[in-house]
């Protein structure tokens, strides 16, 4: 598991997700990456340093290496969604701010479980989705397949063709 909340994580979602996962029956390694601006690093480290399953990193320059090695990603609905998608990493995400709410890519059609706004997320809902994802190999493979089917390599061309098509429809009216 990789927990990756980009930015300063002002809502302390990294700790909330870690604490919630540890309250379940899940007993495998959990990597947590927090950004340079994360202010609760000392509290986070001291709280979980005795747990041999938890590794906490701050200001990591090779985030993509961690994403590549992850079986499941827990993240904010940020640009990391594209990395996860390109690698086919089953992902659960939440919106942590208004900017992320505008990112329409993070949805089930693209193989991503989006739990919506972090402010209104019930821990029970996260636990249910998390355990379902951990325990359901078919679901993870389905998410992986949806993600890998998306052509991110030709993103500019894809967007350009959509814009041209919409423009043609507009002109034809």
Question: Where on the chain are the PLM-derived regions?
Answer:
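Nucleotide-activated sugar donor-binding and catalytic core shared by glycosyltransferases
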Residues: 1-173
């Amino acid at each position: 598991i990789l927990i990756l909340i980009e930015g300063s994580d002002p809502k302390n979602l990294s700790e909330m997700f870690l604490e919630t996962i540890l309250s379940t029956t899940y007993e495998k390694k959990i990597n947590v990456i927090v950004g340079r601006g994360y202010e609760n690093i000392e509290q986070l480290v001291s709280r979980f340093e005795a747990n041999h399953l938890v590794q906490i990193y701050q200001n990591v320059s090779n985030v993509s290496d961690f994403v590549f090695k992850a079986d499941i990603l827990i993240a904010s609905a940020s640009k990391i969604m594209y990395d996860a998608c390109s690698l086919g990493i089953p992902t659960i995400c939440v919106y942590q701010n208004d900017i992320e709410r505008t990112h329409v890519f993070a949805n089930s059609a693209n193989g991503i479980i989006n739990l919506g706004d972090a402010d209104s997320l019930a821990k029970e809902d996260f636990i249910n989705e998390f355990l379902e994802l951990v325990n359901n190999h078919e679901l993870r493979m389905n998410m992986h397949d949806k993600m890998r089917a998306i052509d991110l390599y030709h993103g500019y061309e894809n967007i350009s063709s959509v814009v041209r098509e919409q423009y043609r429809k507009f002109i034809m009216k």
